[in-house]
Amino acid sequence: MAQSPQVLLSALADESAFDLTAVEQFTALAALGLEYYSLRFIDVGKGVKNVMKLSLPEIRRIRQLEDRYGLNVASIASPIGKTKLVDVDDGTRNAFVPFERYLARDVARACELAHAFETKLIRGFSFYPPKGSAPADHLEQAVDRIGRIAEACHRSDLTFGLEVEANLVGRDGHLLAEIHRRVNHPGLVLVFDAANLVVQGFSTAQVWSQWEAMKPGLGWVHVKDYRKTTARPRAGHVEEGKLADFVPADRGAGGHARILADLHGFLPALTRRLKRRGIPGVFVDLEPHLRGGGQFAGTSGPDGMGIALRSLCGVLDGAGIAYHLRDFDDLLAARGLG
């Protein structure tokens, strides 16, 4: 019998913890059987920090805890690209940073962190155009910046993953796919997230269309879902802090069953392509927001993360996609008895 293609399960670790301490995050993920996590917000004893703000002693302590809990970093879940594209007052609280400074400081820092945590992947975004403006009007400027970020990552032997999300230039799958096509760089891949489309008012059929548009550039998948509503117009600005109807992957309007069944067909080829860049495989990264989400983070708690993981595993089983959760053989190997 042919072996089923396999994904690597991961999660935004901070979603699994109420207080965001490293021990709380890692305990939850290890208990769920995960071996990979994406690093975003964490408390290593000096308060909660974004990964970009971690000190060298904090990095060393996290690495020690990773060894203790048997975890590896899937991606640096950075906020790169969540700044204004244009320095205008548009009524938002988004910051503007001159791009040359941003490239030399923030992007370089993200690359340093990826090497420190021994991952090949940095997650980022496609910049905020002025609120109320047409994203297509800012495509050329976004393409230029993202291309330079991709080149910086590539020169560091890393890959930049561009996530689809509301309010950005690449707010839908077609725009993000066009950015990827124009940048045309091996250091750039796309990160699909169904809920980030549903919250904008897109139907399940429209989410599918955007998945198809993103497939040629796909690098990995974020999994969260949202209960369909009709109260939110597609063209409008999404107030991310007010979103409250996130659900597991088998209950929302994102169409994960069809999407992951489709992934099954090209998963072996995508895995081979990523491995040529030193990436261990195709990550399916849980970011469920089951207790709520906002512009820069969300929370699910340890129980919510467990609910989300079991839901995802059921959808993967239905799609015929294999995955691995830690078992007794892994525990024996960790004890040196395997």
Please give the residue ranges for each predicted region:
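Active-site acidic/histidine proton-transfer and metal-coordination neighborhood
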Residues: 28, 68, 84-190, 303-304
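N-terminal substrate-binding region of glycoside hydrolase catalytic domains
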Residues: 12-14, 28, 32-56, 77
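Histidine-acidic metal/acid-base catalytic patches
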Residues: 2-10, 19-35, 67, 173-338
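Short beta-strand segments at enzyme active-site cores
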Residues: 38-39, 73-78, 119-126, 159-163, ...
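Alpha-helix-loop-beta-strand connector modules within alpha/beta enzyme cores
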Residues: 56-78, 143-156, 182-183, 254-261
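Active-site beta-loop-alpha junctions enriched in small/polar residues
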Residues: 12-16, 40-44, 78-81, 127-129, ...
